[in-house]
Amino acid sequence: KYAKADLFIYNGLSNEKTITKNLINKNKNLLIIDVSNGLSYTYGVKELWMSPNNYLMLAKNIKDYLKEYLDSKIIVNYVDQKYEDLAEILSLKDAELRSIGKEAKEKGTNTIVVSDNVFKFLENYDFHVVSLDEETLTEGTLNSIRNNFKKENYNTILVLDNNYTDNINSIIKDYKAK
């Protein structure tokens, strides 16, 4: 079904590269856009979509590739306008995150407990991110997090994709974390 399409947009930083190769083998006329061109991530591919700045770069890559493929000036102008609309929205989101982070830092409430290191991009917005990511979690960090929940310094955990680990479930149960 996808091999009959005219255009395939994919993230070249994930396993979609294999899918893309298979599609090209079935459809030599398939136009390809790798949205991740020039981008990288540290903690997980999802941070590309969660961070307003990275999201904007993904959109810019799509816009630039589309403009290479398009012949109609009207459609090129439409693509440019839609990109500008999105850029404005994402710039506002970026500014809002910066404002929230700055205010939280001034109040001393900028610590965020998260389930996954993918949220570490929030450190760019003055948040102190404490992660329960199983791949990097140490016993000392876990004990510190538990102690802060016990003292009611923390009360919430941001959880990615409903990935409730045993540690997260235990903290929720023991300290009534949200």
What are these model-derived regions, one by one?
Residues K1-K178:
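Extracytoplasmic metal-acquisition and chelation regions
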